[in-house]
Amino acid sequence: MTDSTYDVARVRTYLQDLQTRIADALGALDGTPLATDAWQRGPAERLRGGGCTRILEGGRVFERAGIGFSDVAGDALPPSASAARPQLAGRGFEALGVSLVLHPRNPYCPTVHMNVRMLIATKPGEEPVFWFGGGMDLTPVYGFEDDARHFHQTCKDALDPFGVELYPRFKKWCDEYFFLKHRNEMRGIGGIFFDDFSEPGFERSFDMMQSVGDAFLQAYLPIVERRAELPYGERERDFQAYRRGRYVEFNLVFDRGTLFGLQSGGRTESILMSMPPVANWRYNWQPEPGSPEARLYSDFIVPRDWI
């Protein structure tokens, strides 16, 4: 850590505003406002604090859209948060962040995930340790190269002011993180992912996190606007449900945010709002060679330089 001076109030204000801005934009696009569910945990519970969930289900564009803000504290960092820093195991902590997953109705519209967060680990008699994490990644059912290039270029543009080395570093991290080991396949086309980030100090790290959060709508909404009205049929919806099964597998088996929430006694409804509304599994299914479904596997959910 380069310093231990930080301003949680500023981070909290930014995150709450980010949630509102994104929820308003999605509601305007869909034509249905996102519902608001504010929640609070009691002081005697294992995880203290509260948050707000903005949720849309059964919309015109989004079959499910969830954006969660939370600011919680606990007495001991769970294993998922301290795996990379064993010296912090057992410390008290505060975690605040915004996390979203959007599942569009149209199979030609990709699912997207974005998260920005800050964690502070504390121990009596020692300086607090803080770090930022987050990123965004795109999970298409049917791939479009111009969508992938646009998404990755927007991510790069958000990071370049803080160092041209960050995009390739965070892109590689994303490719490796969102990988289903038991399937030997990527979850989607990636994006950027970072964690344990505080190298430049609080101000610069916070600015970088804000740049990522602020870039989300520009990265994603133009893609939805291009694809949301494309015609589709039962075949495309079936493949969408099949690919959503992979999303479920990753979130429940590998995702550090999901594991952190469940291990720390988090709010289950908020943690699992990332699940798709419909998913299915087929035994040993393979796409027809040369089909659009096969092209997802050969051309998109493989490590690739998009820009």
Curated annotation (Swiss-Prot):
Catalyzed reactions: coproporphyrinogen III + O2 + 2 H(+) = protoporphyrinogen IX + 2 CO2 + 2 H2O
Q: Which residues bind a divalent metal cation?
A: 103, 113, 152, 182
Which keywords appear in this protein's UniProt record, sorted alphabetically? Cytoplasm, Heme biosynthesis, Metal-binding, Oxidoreductase, Porphyrin biosynthesis
One GO BP on record is: protoporphyrinogen IX biosynthetic process
Q: In which pathway does it act?
A: Porphyrin-containing compound metabolism; protoporphyrin-IX biosynthesis; protoporphyrinogen-IX from coproporphyrinogen-III (O2 route): step 1/1
List the residue(s) that the UniProt entry marks as the site Important for dimerization: 182
Question: Which superkingdom does the taxonomy of this entry point to?
Answer: Bacteria
For activity, the cofactor(s) needed are: a divalent metal cation
Question: Could you say which EC number(s) this protein's record lists?
Answer: 1.3.3.3
User: Sorted alphabetically, which InterPro entries does this protein's record hold?
Assistant: Coprogen_oxidase_aer (IPR001260), Coprogen_oxidase_aer_sf (IPR036406), Coprogen_oxidase_CS (IPR018375)
Gene Ontology terms: cellular component: cytoplasm
Q: Which SUPFAM superfamilies match?
A: Coproporphyrinogen III oxidase
Q: Which residues bind substrate?
A: 99, 115-117, 265-267
Question: Where in the sequence is the active site?
Answer: 113
Q: Where does it reside? A: Cytoplasm
Which residues lie within the region annotated Important for dimerization?
247-282
Family stated for the protein in its record: Belongs to the aerobic coproporphyrinogen-III oxidase family.
NCBIfam families, alphabetically?
A: PRK05330.1
Q: What role is this protein assigned?
A: Involved in the heme biosynthesis. Catalyzes the aerobic oxidative decarboxylation of propionate groups of rings A and B of coproporphyrinogen-III to yield the vinyl groups in protoporphyrinogen-IX.
What is the name attached to this protein's record? Oxygen-dependent coproporphyrinogen-III oxidase
Which species is this record about? Burkholderia lata (strain ATCC 17760 / DSM 23089 / LMG 22485 / NCIMB 9086 / R18194 / 383)
